[in-house]
Amino acid sequence: MALPPGPAALRHTLLLLPALLSSGWGELEPQIDGQTWAERALRENERHAFTCRVAGGPGTPRLAWYLDGQLQEASTSRLLSVGGEAFSGGTSTFTVTAHRAQHELNCSLQDPRSGRSANASVILNVQFKPEIAQVGAKYQEAQGPGLLVVLFALVRANPPANVTWIDQDGPVTVNTSDFLVLDAQNYPWLTNHTVQLQLRSLAHNLSVVATNDVGVTSASLPAPGLLATRVEVPLLGIVVAAGLALGTLVGFSTLVACLVCRKEKKTKGPSRHPSLISSDSNNLKLNNVRLPRENMSLPSNLQLNDLTPDSRAVKPADRQMAQNNSRPELLDPEPGGLLTSQGFIRLPVLGYIYRVSSVSSDEIWL
């Protein structure tokens, strides 16, 4: 016959009874803020303390915190033990500073006796105000009056932002179907907002405003900067075309002037003056040219050898003219006569060259 339990054993059983009834004796289920799985929205840089609770059971379990799979150190931890083989319950607290890169917080409980483990999880939804990563526009000619403008803005926000395009006349009404949304799995919180407009007048500036529950962000889009790609290319083409046209005109004018000069030279013909050909000794020589009368000047660098013609080539008419124009006392019909003895050299047909003394030099030729 079994004896009734003593006072000490009865007191021990009464202490374990609430834990055994709530957990089902051996079923260890941790909870974070009273829930096994939950989602919590936090603002960026917000601090929040999470508490993990576990009911009593046999043995003494171990509690640990994991943030995105990384083991964390608990802020406070307390387990209530009842005897050596059971505990009545425990709590553990962990404080999180929210960042947008954080996603999940886990409280893990492990039973050392059975090796079983249980987890409680909280999904972190970190919210932040919109960030405009990039904004731009592309212009093209429209079929009607004005310009066809494609505006785009890359906005990063959580929760997703409402984007409004504003010009100098106020907000631009845009159909949401014109928005192109990128794949959120590959680009978290990044949305491409694109809208196509037709401007009938050039706005001073364009701006985009992104708003959500956390905050508001705006960015301006100056019109002169946007129209640079549309204006610079035609202007450059005009400058290049003007330069080419000017160069062509100058070249054509030069060619016409050269042709006119050549035509005039051919029309006038050769010069009436005798041509002088320069010799190797830099002296001018007469080439088959009849010398002028004796009272005309000769070139200063002319030598006597250049003016001595062949006596056989002298015509009788020229000889008679020279005798009529010469003084009788200076005639020298025979070589080596009076003129030769007086220092004169007779040049038949062509006249005489006189050599006299000079004050500035030894002699001068006339």
UniProtKB/Swiss-Prot annotation:
Residues 254-366 are cytoplasmic. SUPFAM superfamilies: Immunoglobulin (SSF48726). Disulfide bonds join C52-C107. It is found in: Late endosome; Lysosome. The keyword Secreted applies. PANTHER family: TRANSMEMBRANE PROTEIN 25. Glycans are attached at N106, N162, N175, N192, N205. In neurons, modulates the degradation of NMDA receptor GRIN2B subunit. Plays a role in the regulation of neuronal excitability. It comes from Homo sapiens. This is Transmembrane protein 25. GO terms for biological process: negative regulation of excitatory postsynaptic potential; regulation of protein stability. Interacts with GRIN2B.
